[in-house]
From Swiss-Prot:
UniProt pathway annotation: Carbohydrate degradation; glycolysis; D-glyceraldehyde 3-phosphate and glycerone phosphate from D-glucose: step 3/4
GO molecular function: 6-phosphofructokinase activity; ATP binding; metal ion binding
Protein name per UniProt: ATP-dependent 6-phosphofructokinase
Main localisation: other
InterPro entries: ATP_PFK, PFKA, Phosphofructokinase_dom, PKF_sf, PyroP-dep_PFK_TP0108
Binding-site residues, Mg(2+): D197
GO CC entries: glycosome
HAMAP family linked: Phosphofructokinase_II_X
Positions annotated to bind substrate: T225, I226, D227, M270, G271, R272, E323, Y378, M379, I380, R381
Cofactor: Mg(2+)
EC supergroup of this enzyme: transferase
Lineage summary: Eukaryota, Discoba, Euglenozoa, Kinetoplastea, Metakinetoplastina
Coiled coil: none
Amino acid sequence: METRHHLNTKMVPSYQAPLSKVTAADLTVERLPGCKYMNPSKKHILREEYRDKVKHIMYDPRPQEDLDAEYPVSCNKLVCELAAARKHLHFNPSETSIGIVTCGGICPGLNDVIRSITLTGIISYRVKRVVGFRYGYWGLSKEGSKTAIELSRSDVRQIHRFGGTILGSSRGPQNPKEMVDTLVRMKINILFTVGGDGTQRGALTIYEEAKRPGENIAVFGVPKTIDNDLAFSHRTFGFQTAVEQAVNAVRAAYAEAVSLNYGVGIVKLMGRESGFIAAQTTVASAQANICLIPENPLPKETVMRLIERRLQQSRNCVIVVAEGFGQDWETGTGGHDASGNKKLVDIGFILKKEVESWLRANKEKFPQGTVKYIDPSYMIRACPPSSNDALFCTNLATLAVHEAMAGATGCIISMRYNNYILVPIKAATSVRRVVSLRGALWRQVREITVGLSDDVQQWNEQDLRRHLESLNVERERIIARLASKV
């Protein structure tokens, strides 16, 4: 597991990383010992889906390209544990208290997850109580724990109709010992952490602290990342809703651009290090002409040439840009937010200024050129989930309760190859999933957007030359250092 943290995985899709770096131990979920309590649901007696035996799916079942066979099959021997309801439980339902905490930025589906965890615990397992901790991990601190609320069926029955989170949220870590002390003092047996990679890294510290002698606490993560960049997962809740809402923004930008003489519409979307929302919105809308994502860095000159090419073809241009693109275009203020995320420069505003300046410089060629800028990010994050995302949230939360009651801990619930699986938190937070520039999604983007393959290739070659030059400089420095020691 430790070798993964030394991998340089930035901008490299997780599935392209060598399988030799992922071991069976990395994907093995810890379970608290002993399952002596019977599931209170009578359905487990006859229903096959209530099982104690853990089933698995292959980590990567896709056919391997290097196999010379008429029907190639996967040679990957690594497996992931399938999530399911269990016949026997680790925790005695009538004596079990469940805790829920939501952290980080809001996202469509948070209330759905809170609702489903609460109702599954109360109705299916008849647990003693469900407690909601307010405003992120602060709610687990000694001071914040005073604001905790007990959740009932009536409290959560209708919350899925609204965006945001009824528990509130915040960024930033808290002392793990203090948080576990709160869980022990309030007699919480299972803590569900709903949040992104920063939240789950915090959950990992709670999980490690909860291992201290005499404690019997399960820590279970429900991952929330609207960017859809979670490792070992092909889908995270809120992502599909975000794409649907983002398409509306692109359509508005298109309406503005097409109504003007040489109109340019710019839409900035979420995506700090992964451009899944921008890429899928570009394909789904079929009205964006340029897609800019962090995985495909381009200089200002190339972007301006892309705009020029589009305006020459048609008197309008729509640009979709992910917030993490072009962070080298201007020097940022530096620093990090409370969650440890690097503060980004506002690429949407910068791009707008650059395009306006370029249009002024080319006024004779593109008279009356106008730029319209739309940033729908906070509107997207705050809306309730689509019906498909709501269903997904319910499935994730329900299975999370089933597995946690059976003693699964230190893991998250996710979807991979259309199966709900369990992944250890340490593995899930060790690498970020990004858009593959050689994959089908980016191929679709390239097919429907304007391109300057020669310019992009030239830029990539220049970047490679700069990298090689830096390596040569470093090599000469090492040789000189060694020579001085002789």
